[in-house]
From Swiss-Prot:
Name of the protein: Palmitoyltransferase ZDHHC3
Entries under PROSITE patterns matching the protein: DHHC
Transmembrane segments: 48-68, 73-93, 172-192, 215-235
Catalytic activity: L-cysteinyl-[protein] + hexadecanoyl-CoA = S-hexadecanoyl-L-cysteinyl-[protein] + CoA; L-cysteinyl-[protein] + tetradecanoyl-CoA = S-tetradecanoyl-L-cysteinyl-[protein] + CoA; L-cysteinyl-[protein] + octadecanoyl-CoA = S-octadecanoyl-L-cysteinyl-[protein] + CoA
Gene that specifies this protein: Zdhhc3
Domain DHHC, chain residue ranges per copy: 128-254
Entry keyword annotation includes Nucleotide-binding: no
GO BP terms in the entry: lipoprotein localization to membrane; positive regulation of receptor localization to synapse; positive regulation of synaptic transmission, GABAergic; positive regulation of toll-like receptor 9 signaling pathway; protein localization to photoreceptor outer segment; protein localization to plasma membrane; protein targeting; protein targeting to membrane
Length: 299
């Protein structure tokens, strides 16, 4: 009877052709600290530009159609501050999600010398990606757009032109949250402005002509409703993924769980940082993810 090995082979293991030094070039020297990460993908760049354009369009309508023409100065100042603060945090989160290395595995380190340096014991295996010639840590997956293996890759999002992974998931969650909040805020203001225009003379409720005002408000309403639904679903999906400590790819592939199960609170702290603070809501605070080894090669 044929015995099934107790360990699971994924892309590689100990196959002679994969361990030849000439098959994998030595890994490149790491760039200087703070080097910006940016994916040169036409679709992703276009989606990122559209995202900024839509936020700036909402900013234009809120300020120049609804708030500045209003005679209620307290209403205009309070809503202007709130909306601009949320928009600023949303765009800052978008930049951090887009320009932060999501957790790329060093490229080209699957050399014979490096594998031998791991000093594998009998029964231990390492996974290799034949596409980028990297030794894959546990829970890493290859992204065909980024052309790299990404640690704890959840998915590749064209709207941030980047993968959502171990190092930038916090910023992606904040981006979806702040976009949902400014969308809700914009919808509420559009509703109040329509009521105000119906009660007052349409020529006095905006500095634009009535037809132009209606078109601008309807477009903003449609945009805000669409983004509110989309980002709310994405936010809920991401929070659920964090709490269960299971990425979107792992859920789709129904991969066998080989990592330790932790509480929901510990999983949240692993993404947003230790300990809990207002920095969780800030795209400028880099999370301290503790002392976990990000390169767990051997399983």
């Amino acid at each position: 009877m044929m015995l099934i090995p107790t360990h699971h082979f994924r892309d590689i293991e100990r196959k002679p052709e994969y361990l030849q030094p000439e098959k994998c070039a030595p890994p490149p020297f790491p760039g200087p600290v703070g080097t910006m990460w940016f994916i040169r993908d036409g679709c992703g760049i276009a989606c990122a530009i559209v995202t900024w354009f839509l936020v700036l369009y909402a900013e234009f309508v809120v300020l120049f159609v609804m708030l500045i023409p209003s005679r209620d100065y307290a209403y205009s100042i309070i809503n202007g501050i709130v909306f601009n603060l949320l928009a600023f945090l949303a765009l800052a989160s978008h930049c951090r999600a887009m320009l932060t290395d999501p957790g790329a595995v060093p490229k080209g380190n699957a050399t014979k010398e490096f594998i031998e340096s791991l000093q594998l014991k009998p029964g231990q295996v390492v996974y290799k990606c034949p596409k980028c010639c990297s030794i894959k840590p546990d829970r890493a997956h290859h992204c065909s757009v980024c052309k790299r293996c990404i640690r704890k890759m959840d998915h590749h999002c064209p709207w941030v032109n980047n993968c959502v992974g171990e190092n930038n998931q916090k910023y992606f969650v904040l981006f979806t949250m702040y976009i949902a909040l400014i969308s809700l805020h914009a919808l509420i203001m559009v509703g109040f402005h329509f009521l105000h225009c119906f009660e007052e003379d349409w020529t006095k409720c905006s500095s634009f002509s009535p037809p132009t005002t209606v078109i601008l408000l309807i477009l903003l309403c449609f945009e805000a409703l669409l983004f509110l639904i989309f980002t709310s679903v994405m936010f809920g999906t991401q929070v659920h993924s964090i709490c269960t400590d299971e990425t979107g790819i792992e859920q789709l592939k129904k991969e066998e769980r080989r990592w330790a199960k932790k509480t929901k609170w510990m999983n949240m702290k692993a993404v947003f940082g230790h300990p809990f603070s207002l920095g969780w809501a800030s795209p400028f605070a880099t999370p301290d993810q503790g002392k976990a080894d990000p390169y767990q090669y051997v399983v």
